[in-house]
From Swiss-Prot:
InterPro entries: Fumarylacetoacetase_C_sf, Hydratase-Decarb/MhpD_sf. GO terms for biological process: mitochondrial RNA processing; mRNA processing. SUPFAM superfamilies: FAH. PANTHER family: 2-KETO-4-PENTENOATE HYDRATASE, ACID HYDRATASE. Its main location: mitochondrion. It comes from the Eukaryota. This is REH2-associated factor 2. Component of the REH2-associated complex (REH2C) composed of helicase REH2, associated factors H2F1 and H2F2, and mRNAs at various editing stages; the formation of the complex is RNA-independent. Interacts with various editing complexes including the RNA editing core (RECC) complex, the gRNA-binding (GRBC) complex (also known as the MRB1 complex) and the RNA editing mediator (REMC) complex. The keyword Aminoacyl-tRNA synthetase does not apply. Keywords: Mitochondrion, mRNA processing, Transit peptide. The gene is H2F2. GO terms for cellular component: cytoplasm; mitochondrial mRNA editing complex; mitochondrion. GO terms for molecular function: 2-oxopent-4-enoate hydratase activity. May play a role in mitochondrial mRNA editing by facilitating the association of the gRNA-binding (GRBC) complex with the RNA editing core (RECC) complex. However, appears to be dispensable for mRNA editing per se.
């Protein structure tokens, strides 16, 4: 039994390393994602273990673990997969690549707005939505470029989560201190997404699990279950706050009005 468990751990580490090669767009031949990712239907424990080993592998490759992305079941990708529960995935420093991207080179399929919170201190491993504001210090408007390491789209929620929710790149605007704005009022604030100065969608932070408080609490809990707890200066990336827009060339801007904006371009 011990030998079987040890062999399985080694295989899991190899799988995480192989996925790092996918994230780095390696030229060498890689195993199919179905051979790397946890099997669908095996339960959340295998996915949590994969994410934990991936955090370790990314650290070995000098990519910092920067936070957790929360994807609600109301988001377009999870609705397509008929998911009933939210998905959490770790995000790493390789996602922060500047503000100009190539849809073809980076295999970007969609552009999505983000509602991003930064922790101002180490949180306890269990939070409630009411106690979340005490550990948060800043809000950032964000934009995410989304694709898939699958040939087209993930076939199920396990694949979606193992593939980090399709995250290719993230770009953030300037920080807004939560001393000057409450978390819930920010969550109620509508934003507008434009492409080439033409509005293409609207949304609000509350579209992620009803408000940022619930999203932060879930992210903190999931990070603790991975064995990689969130710390001061880590981020919570609230996804599903708007719709997905097809990745077309042009400058995209997510505008929160008085709470700032962020711009990034696709070529």
């Amino acid at each position: 039994m011990f030998r079987w468990s040890w062999c399985r751990l080694i295989i899991s580490k190899v799988s995480a390393e192989s996925y790092v090669d996918y994230l780095q767009n390696s030229d060498r031949e890689l195993p199919a994602l179905s051979e790397i990712f946890p099997r669908h239907g095996t339960g959340t424990g295998e996915l949590v273990k994969f994410h934990s080993l991936l955090c370790e592998a990314m650290k070995d490759h000098n990519f910092n673990y920067v936070g957790i992305k929360v994807v609600p079941p109301t988001s377009p990708p999870l609705q397509c997969l008929r998911a009933t529960e939210p998905v959490c995935v770790p995000i790493f420093s390789n996602s922060f690549q500047g503000s100009v991207f190539s849809a073809k080179q980076h295999r970007i399929q969609f552009v999505e707005p983000l509602f991003v919170i930064r922790l101002g201190r180490d949180p306890p491993t269990q939070l409630t939505a009411n106690t979340v504001p005490a550990v948060c210090d800043a809000f950032f408007p964000g934009v995410e470029f989304v694709g898939s390491r699958y040939p087209f789209y993930p076939p199920h929620t396990t694949g979606f989560a193992a593939d980090l929710g399709g995250c290719v790149a993230v770009h953030l605007g300037e920080a807004v201190s939560l001393g000057s704005a409450s978390l819930e009022s920010l969550g109620d604030t509508n934003f507008v997404v434009t492409r080439r100065e033409e509005p293409i969608q609207v949304g609000a932070g509350k579209n992620c699990l009803g408000g940022p408080g619930a999203a932060v609490a879930l992210a903190v809990s999931y990070a603790a279950s991975m064995g990689w707890p969130l710390r001061e200066k880590h981020y919570i990336f609230c996804s599903g706050v708007g719709s997905r827009s097809p990745a077309l060339a042009g400058e995209y801007k997510v505008n929160y009005g008085a709470y700032g904006s962020v711009s990034a371009s696709l070529t």
